[in-house]
From Swiss-Prot:
Main enzyme class: hydrolase
Summary of the tissues where the protein is detected: Isoform 1 is strongly expressed in the AFD and RIA neurons of the head, in the tail and in coelomocytes. Isoform 1 is weakly expressed in nerve cord motor neurons, intestine, and the somatic gonad.
Family from the record: Belongs to the inositol monophosphatase superfamily.
Gene name as annotated: ttx-7
Catalytic activity: a myo-inositol phosphate + H2O = myo-inositol + phosphate; alpha-D-galactose 1-phosphate + H2O = D-galactose + phosphate
Binding site for Mg(2+) 1: 76, 96, 98
Protein name per Swiss-Prot or TrEMBL: Inositol monophosphatase ttx-7
Reported cofactor(s): Mg(2+)
Enzyme Commission no: 3.1.3.25, 3.1.3.94
One GO BP annotation of this record: protein localization to synapse
Activity regulation (record text): Inhibited by Li(+), Ca(2+) and Mn(2+), but also by Mg(2+) at concentrations above 3 mM.
Organism in which the protein naturally occurs: Caenorhabditis elegans
Residues reported in the UniProt entry to bind Mg(2+) 2: 96, 99, 230
Length: 285
């Protein structure tokens, strides 16, 4: 696919967002190296927010809104604070200031600043930046996927028996499903083991899990109960790296559906989907 902008300033948008993300990364690194952070909980004790999350989102939204009038924003902390998700055709920035806040709180260096750009409800660009390891992933529709400027490619493995999967227990889903969720999650992982999967890994961040698939380190990833800001940016990085992103049922991916499956190949994705007990969520928009 050849890059075909659908807005005359689309490249300007992305270039400026990269500048802001790097600036935000300096803020995150400084806080990561500090002895402690103020931590609050949101929906449960697994849903954390720090003052750094809030400061990064403020920096990104203020910087982008000052430069680009009329743009819309969907930010994790803004929504947690009561902002309504407005999913329109206008240029819309979908932002997770720190994906992997629990990792950040515990000083585990697997975190990501995530910024996705949608125009006319199509994800056009994604930036995923781990400021601790200084790894910046970037993709634009039709331009390919890159890590620190170098092209990345998803695995071509088609077999679960040769695959390493990213998957967690998804304890946040107990808020909606109660203890039934533990049975679902354990059944899903057991089915994958019985199908012969080589191993499981979980990096504590949806975005990090997805870019691991994009760069071919892992072969697949599935998650239920995530949000648009977790997956908007990394979803285009996976597809531009040659991978596939779908609903866990195999139907087309909807960034607002609160669930995702990605894989290096469609064949492995289909086999992974067949291992799952599927659940639904109220769409975010």
């Amino acid at each position: 696919m050849v890059f075909q902008p659908i807005h005359e300033e689309e490249q300007v948008f992305v270039d400026y967002a990269i500048e802001l993300v790097k600036k935000a990364g300096t803020l995150v690194r400084t806080a990561f190296d500090s002895p402690e952070s103020k931590v609050d909980t949101k929906s449960s004790n697994t849903d954390l927010v720090t003052e750094t999350d809030q400061a990064v989102e403020k920096l990104l939204i203020e910087g982008l809104s000052e430069r680009f009038k009329g743009h819309r924003f969907i930010g994790e902390e803004s929504v947690a604070g009561g902002a309504k998700i407005e999913w329109t055709d206008a240029p819309t920035w979908i932002i997770d200031p720190i994906d992997g806040t629990t990792n950040f709180v515990h000083r585990i260096p697997m975190i990501a600043i995530c910024v996705g750009l949608a125009i006319k409800k199509q994800i056009r660009a994604g930036i995923v930046y781990n400021p601790i390891t200084n790894e910046l992933y970037l993709a634009q529709l039709g331009k390919g996927a890159f890590k620190n400027g170098f092209p990345i490619r998803a695995s071509k493995n088609q077999l679960l028996s040769k695959g390493v999967l990213c998957q967690s227990l998804g304890l946040h889903n107990r808020v909606q499903f109660g203890d039934r969720w533990l049975d679902i999650a354990q059944s899903n992982m057991r089915n994958q083991v019985m199908a012969g999967v080589r191993g499981h890994r979980s990096f504590g961040s949806a975005a990090i899990n997805m870019v691991m698939v994009a760069q071919g380190s892992c072969d697949g990833y599935v998650e239920y109960g995530i949000h648009a800001w977790d997956v908007a940016a990394p979803s285009i990085i996976v597809t531009e790296a040659g991978g596939v992103v779908t609903d866990p049922t195999g139907s087309p991916f909807d960034v607002m559906s609160r669930k995702v499956l990605c894989a290096g190949t469609a064949e492995l994705g289909r086999d992974l989907s067949a291992c799952l007990t599927h659940v639904d969520f109220e769409p975010e928009a």
